[in-house]
Structure formats: structure tokens, C-alpha cells
Amino acid sequence: MRKSEHKLTFMQTLIMISSTLIGAGVLTLPRSAAETGSPSGWLMILLQGVIFIIIVLLFLPFLQKNSGKTLFKLNSIVAGKFIGFLLNLYICLYFIGIVCFQARILGEVVGFFLLKNTPMAVVVFIFLAVAIYHVGGGVYSIAKVYAYIFPITLIIFMMLLMFSFRLFQLDFIRPVFEGGYQSFFSLFPKTLLYFSGFEIIFYLVPFMRDPKQVKKAVALGIATSTLFYSITLLIVIGCMTVAEAKTVTWPTISLIHALEVPGIFIERFDLFLQLTWTAQQFACMLGSFKGAHIGLTEIFHLKNKNNAWLLTAMLAATFFITMYPKDLNDVFYYGTLLGYAFLIVITIPFFVWFLSWIQKKIGRGQLQ
């Protein structure tokens, strides 16, 4: 097989970005947004989507100009060994944190709804072990997993939300800015984590067949997930009210569980949601897991990118961290902290780009 055939196409890149963004938020976003008491979470999602698209379009030219290198390599070249090491370590720890958060949510949902008699530790370990297997297979194999799962997920989710629309009441999402602007902007930290995922572009650019299309792929990927989350939140709140959504652990599942469609013999629509979401949530972990793998390979200068010791250590570390939170309240608290860590992560390309610009000005530039 020719080398070019292993490169990611525009559509594969777009699907990877969208799939990594769409995960736990499908089930937990309505509750997180409802905790502020504002029914305008869907507007905050749209606003955040626009903000993050602008941020990405600002730092992508730096990655495009050096499309043969991941951000991990750029950090080491521009910032030097020590600072580059710290930056790369932070990104890796962040990616691992995201994987653990996603894996714990996956374990909680599967254990509660699908495998009630199976210990959650067993469920989590199996999913992490399968994920590590895919991580060892490389970026292209992960892209193929995304390509199979994402379209099915999108179609089934949209169909279920359309069926739910018959329960929608406009009064439940009004007034739009109830509680004033302070209440509206208090939504920002609550919904921040659900935009984590597009950072996989830090390492994806060198794997693209045509890096010139990266801006379009990432912008459309973020836009797709933004619309998906906004519609999900709008319909769930519009069917359940804010007061009910914040008292239910998994509002989306509760809504679909209560769904009845006349003329259709299917009674448990929530099973379709749970099964497709489980596959999507698993796929969502892969992008961040691979990011941590590539970063650690760079940090430890490993020639064998599929080093068995590294993959085993990653599996063990993520498993124990995933099982550390005592309950769901702890999980959601750590999720909020990850949201703030996400803000720091997306400043790193700007910091390295600024250092590179200074080096060029003083005649020590090593990059384009």
C-alpha cells in the first residue's frame, strides 16, 4: 500500500474532530446546563462554538506551516528541551484526564443501564483495553473506526430527537435570558468541557493527505458538534423543563425512555440511544488516547511507537485514575476542572508560535 493511502482524507479528519467532540455531553450536558437555572444553554453552546472556531482558525496557520510536525515536536524545537518537556507533559496529562473522564462516564452508564450485575471496574477495564489495542494500531485505523460509528450515531440520535419533538413546549425554554446576563454567562464553565476534543488536531495535521484543508475540516467538525449539542440541549430542556433536568442524572436517557410513538411497536427507544451512545463514547476516547500516546512517545524519545511497556503503563494508569472518583458528583467536579485545563491547553500553540516569532526576529528561528 502506498504511503499516501495511509494519509487521512478531508472527510476522515472532519469525522475524527466531530466524533471526538461528541461523547459524554450527549447524556450529561442538559444536567450541567440546567444546574445554573437558565433555559438558555443552547444559546451558550452556539456562542462557544463560534468562539472556539475562531480560536482554532487563529492558531492553525502555525501548524499548517509546519505540517510535517506534531505540536509535541514543535514544542521541543521552539521552547527547548525543558520547557518543551513541561508543555508536552501537560498536554499528555490533559489527554489522559479526558480519557479517564470519558471512560468513567461510560462505565457508569453501561453499568447502570445495560450490565447491572457486572462490576463497573470490569466494564471500564474492558473498554480501556480495547481502546489501547486501537491506539497501538495507529491514527489511520482509529479514523476507520470513527468512519463506521459516527454516521450511524448521528442518524439514530437525530431520529430519536425528532420523535421527542412531539413533547416539546416552547414555554419551557422561555424567557431566553431568564435570570439576566449573569445567569447566562454562568453557563460558560458548566458547558466548557464538552468542546474539548478538537485539540487532537495538535497531532493530526502531519497525518493529513492535504494539510491545506485542515481549517475547513476543523471548523466544520466543531460546527457539526455545536449544532448537535445545541439541538440536543434545546429539545431536552424544551421537553423536560430546567427544574426537572437538573434533578435527573441522565436527562437525555430519561426523555427517550419516556418516549411513546403511536403506531410503532417498539417500546424501549432508550435502548437504541444507550447502544449507539456506548459505541460513540468509546470512539470519543480514542482520539485523546492516541494524543497521549503520541505525546509520551515524543517525551521518552521512543523509536518503537508501539512500545508494549508504554501501552501497558497507559492502560494501568488510566484504569486506576478512572476508578479514583468516589461517585458521580466527584466525576462531574473533575470534569469542571478539566474544562479549565482545556482553556490552558488551547493557549499552548499561541505561546509556542509567539516564541517562534521572537526567535525569527533575533535570527534564531528554526521553523517556517
Curated annotation (Swiss-Prot):
The keyword Hydrolase does not apply. It comes from Bacillus subtilis (strain 168). The chain crosses the membrane at residues 10-30, 43-63, 82-102, 120-140, 145-165, 187-207, 217-237, 282-302, 308-328, 338-358. Keywords: Amino-acid transport, Cell membrane, Germination, Membrane, Transmembrane, Transmembrane helix, Transport. It comes from the Bacteria. One of its GO terms (biological process) is amino acid transport. It is found in: Cell membrane. Involved in the response to the germinative mixture of L-asparagine, glucose, fructose and potassium ions (AGFK). Could be an amino acid transporter. Cannot stimulate germination in the absence of gerD and gerK gene products (fructose and glucose receptors, respectively). It is a multi-pass membrane protein. InterPro entries: Spore_GerAB. This is Spore germination protein B2. Its main location: membrane. One of its GO terms (cellular component) is plasma membrane. Belongs to the amino acid-polyamine-organocation (APC) superfamily. Spore germination protein (SGP) (TC 2.A.3.9) family. Pfam families: Spore_permease. Coiled coil: none annotated.
